Amino acid sequence: MNVLLCSINTLKRLYDISAVEVGQHFYWQIGSFQVHAQVLITSWVVIALLLVSAILIIRNLQTIPAFGQNFFEYVLEFIRDVSKTQIGEEYGPWVPFIGTLFLFIFVSNWSGALLPWKIIQLPHGELAAPTNDINTTVALALLTSIAYFYAGLSKKGLAYFNKYIQPTPILLPINILEDFTKPLSLSFRLFGNILADELVVVVLVSLVPLVVPIPVMFLGLFTSGIQALIFATLAAAYIGESMEGHH
């Protein structure tokens, strides 16, 4: 009997873990529309962190940089290198866009692990990292799509559309489909990795709430940074591709 009760309790615990979900949505009702307030609030927090950090650094620039200025200069140099490698010699105007994507995604991903969002009490639902919501990642992917369309059209004009029938008109449907798969792959890759990371941490904390989840959390911080780099690199590559016309 004791063995049976133990087995039932174990199965019940596993069932509870299988139902784990990361966060509940917090909505604002605006007319007949429901807005994901969770995403807006946490995105504003991330944007505020970036703006405040930038203002504090640039208001007192020095010839011999201190730690903060030196760190930001290193980040800027890194983003320039990524942009130049993927876009080419005309990378200059696109550094702010690529840098904004990278920093926003990077800080958003890390905020999910480092900021105690769940401490903030809401009427219903709870806060989580912005990139933990598919709406954020799809919006970032659509911005990237608009950017590479603009890059191609601004450089080549209507001749940009010749790429859809190169090297042969038979590939027209595939080339059109590619414009839909690019934002889909960008958005779902980022969303899936961040969501999976948070789910793994939640499940491990439920099973072993002490030391074991800590290495996984550090691994999550590393993969979060890698995901930000991948997104920014692919965005720059798509922009460079649209300007050069290569597939």
Curated annotation (Swiss-Prot):
Main localization, broad class: plastid
UniProt xrefs under InterPro entries: ATP_syn_F0_a_bact/chloroplast, ATP_synth_F0_asu, ATP_synth_F0_asu_AS, F0_ATP_A_sf
A Gene Ontology term for the protein's cellular component: chloroplast thylakoid membrane
GO molecular function: proton-transporting ATP synthase activity, rotational mechanism
Transmembrane segments: 38-58, 95-115, 134-154, 199-219, 220-240
Localization terms from the record: Plastid, Chloroplast thylakoid membrane
A Pfam family this chain is assigned to: ATP-synt_A
Organism domain of life: Eukaryota
Recorded topology in the membrane: Multi-pass membrane protein
Keywords, comma-separated and alphabetical: ATP synthesis, CF(0), Chloroplast, Hydrogen ion transport, Ion transport, Membrane, Plastid, Thylakoid, Transmembrane, Transmembrane helix, Transport
PROSITE patterns in alphabetical order: ATPASE_A
Cited PANTHER family: ATP SYNTHASE SUBUNIT A, CHLOROPLASTIC (PTHR42823:SF3)
Role description: Key component of the proton channel; it plays a direct role in the translocation of protons across the membrane.
Subunit composition and interactions: F-type ATPases have 2 components, CF(1) - the catalytic core - and CF(0) - the membrane proton channel. CF(1) has five subunits: alpha(3), beta(3), gamma(1), delta(1), epsilon(1). CF(0) has four main subunits: a, b, b' and c.
Family, per entry: Belongs to the ATPase A chain family.
Record protein name field: ATP synthase subunit a, chloroplastic
Lineage: Eukaryota, Viridiplantae, Streptophyta, Embryophyta, Tracheophyta
